[in-house]
C-alpha cells in the first residue's frame, strides 16, 4: 500500500521514530511496504477473542472500532492511528479481546507469516520492530504507574468523603446504623451520607451516579455536597431534592445523572419522609417480621432535567424496625452463568439473616458475603453500596 500515507499517521511516526523530514530506516521501510490495506464492514470483527493471531497486526487508518472483553463487555474504543494486535507478530498467543468495526473501518495489516518472511530476509525489520515495541511498552508502563498513583490519591480523597465512623450516630438512643461502599474500580460513583439536621431529625441517603471511575466520582462529590447543603438548612425534603437537581443540571454537558433515595427520620414521631429519585426501593423489616420491599412511586433522577417537582412520601420506622438501602450493584451482580442476583434472591438473602438484624455491622457483613457467594468469583462490574439502619 501507499507508504507515504502510512508515514503521515502520527502513531506510526511515533512508533517507528520517523523524522519530520519523513526519513525512515531500511527496516521500517521494508515493514511498511509489506503492509496491505483491508476494509472491514460494519459489525464485523477485526480480531476475535480466543482466536489465533496469524493475521498479525492492524493499524486503523479510517473509522472507529470497539473493544470487547471475553464476557462481551465494551471496554474501549479505538480510532485512527490505534494499533491492534501488535504482539501477535512476535508470539503465538490467542487474541485477548474482540475488536469490532463500528461502521466501515480501513486498516493497514501485516500477517504474522509475512512479517516472519520479511524479518528472515532483513534482520533489521525484526530489530526495528522489537525496539519500537519495547519503547512503546516502556512508555505504557510508565503512564500506567502514573495513573495508578493518581487513582490511589483519588481513592483516598473519596474514602475521606464518605462517613466511616458511625459511633456518634450509634450513641443516639434511637438508632443503630452502618454503611459501606465497595467500588468496582479504584474510585466509584456510588455514595451515601448521614447527618443530623437538628436534635430530632436525622438525614440518611444512598445514591448512584451514572458511569464509573473518576468522572462519576467527581459528579458524586458535587451531588453529595448539594444535597447536604440544602438539607442542613432545614428545607422540606422535596425542596432539597429540587434545588440539588437544578444545581446538578447546570452546565451538565456530559448528561450525567444520579439516582438517589433520601430519607429524613423524625426521632420523636418515628416518621420517615423520603424522596425516591429513580433509585432501587429499599427493604423494611418490621419487628419480628420478614424483610419486604417498600411500595413507593419514583421521581425523576437528579441531574437530568431542570425544575422537576419532587414528591415526598412517608413510612413509619418504629422501635425494633430496620431499613436496608442499596445500589443496583447488589441486584445486578452476576454469577459465572451471567445470571443477575435480582430482587427475589436479595429478599431471600435478607431474610436468611433477619435474626441478626439488630447488629448493623454484622448484618451488612453478611450481606456482602452473600453477594460474593452468589458471584462465585465473577468480576464485580459495578459499585456495591449498602446503608442499614435499625431502630433501638
Each model region followed by its residue ranges:
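Short hydrophobic beta-strand segments that form the core of ligand-binding sensory/regulatory domains
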Residues: 88, 97-100, 105-112, 192-193, ...
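A small-molecule sensor/coupling module
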Residues: 27, 113-144
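Short strand-connecting beta-turns/loops that link adjacent beta-strands
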Residues: 52, 70-72, 92, 104, ...
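… and, occasionally, acidic/histidine-rich disordered N-termini of signaling adaptors
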Residues: 142-322, 373, 378-392
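Cyclic nucleotide-binding regulatory module and flanking cytosolic helices
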Residues: 1-44
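Active-site-proximal, acidic helix/loop segment immediately C-terminal to a metal-coordinating Asp/Glu
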Residues: 215-233, 317, 321-378
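Cyclic nucleotide-binding regulatory domains
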Residues: 44-103
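Short beta-strand segments in beta-sandwich/barrel cores
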Residues: 36, 45, 64-69, 83, ...
Amino acid at each position: 500500500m501507499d507508504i507515504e500515507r502510512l508515514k503521515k499517521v502520527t502513531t506510526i511516526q511515533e512508533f517507528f521514530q520517523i523524522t519530520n523530514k519523513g526519513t525512515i530506516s531500511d527496516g521500517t521501510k521494508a515493514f511498511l511496504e509489506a503492509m496491505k490495506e483491508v476494509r472491514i464492514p460494519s459489525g464485523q470483527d477485526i480480531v476475535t477473542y480466543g482466536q489465533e493471531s496469524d493475521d498479525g497486526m492492524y493499524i486503523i487508518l479510517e473509522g472507529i472500532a470497539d473493544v470487547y472483553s471475553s464476557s462481551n463487555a465494551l471496554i474501549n474504543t479505538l480510532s485512527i492511528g490505534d494499533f491492534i494486535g501488535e504482539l501477535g507478530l512476535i508470539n503465538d498467543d490467542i487474541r485477548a479481546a474482540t475488536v469490532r468495526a463500528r461502521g466501515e473501518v480501513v486498516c493497514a495489516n501485516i500477517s504474522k507469516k509475512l512479517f516472519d518472511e520479511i524479518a528472515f530476509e532483513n534482520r533489521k525489520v525484526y530489530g526495528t520492530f522489537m525496539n519500537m515495541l519495547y519503547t512503546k511498552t516502556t512508555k505504557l508502563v510508565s503512564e500506567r504507574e502514573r495513573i495508578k498513583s493518581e487513582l490511589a490519591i483519588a481513592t483516598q480523597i473519596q474514602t475521606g468523603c464518605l462517613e466511616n465512623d458511625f459511633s456518634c450516630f450509634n450513641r443516639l438512643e434511637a438508632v443503630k446504623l452502618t454503611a459501606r461502599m465497595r467500588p468496582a474500580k479504584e474510585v466509584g460513583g456510588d455514595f451515601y451520607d448521614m447527618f443530623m439536621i437538628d436534635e430530632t431529625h436525622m438525614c440518611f441517603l444512598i445514591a448512584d451516579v451514572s458511569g464509573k471511575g473518576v468522572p462519576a466520582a467527581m459528579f458524586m462529590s458535587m451531588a453529595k455536597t448539594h444535597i447536604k447543603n440544602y438539607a442542613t438548612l432545614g428545607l422540606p425534603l422535596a425542596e432539597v431534592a429540587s434545588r440539588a437537581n437544578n444545581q446538578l443540571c447546570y452546565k451538565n454537558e456530559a448528561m450525567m445523572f444520579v439516582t438517589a433515595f433520601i430519607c429524613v427520620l423524625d426521632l420523636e414521631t418515628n416518621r420517615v419522609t423520603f424522596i425516591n429519585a429513580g433509585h432501587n426501593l429499599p427493604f423494611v423489616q418490621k419487628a419480628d417480621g420478614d424483610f419486604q420491599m417498600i411500595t413507593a412511586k419514583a421521581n425523576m433522577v437528579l441531574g437530568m432535567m431542570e425544575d422537576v417537582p419532587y414528591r415526598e412520601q412517608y413510612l413509619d420506622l418504629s422501635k425494633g424496625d430496620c431499613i436496608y438501602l442499596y445500589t443496583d450493584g447488589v441486584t445486578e451482580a452476576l454469577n459465572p452463568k451471567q445470571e443477575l442476583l435480582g430482587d427475589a434472591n436479595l429478599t431471600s438473602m435478607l431474610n436468611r439473616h433477619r435474626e441478626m438484624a439488630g447488629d448493623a455491622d454484622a448484618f451488612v457483613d453478611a450481606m456482602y458475603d452473600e453477594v460474593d457467594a452468589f458471584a462465585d468469583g465473577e468480576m464485580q462490574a459495578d459499585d456495591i453500596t449498602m446503608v442499614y439502619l435499625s431502630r433501638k
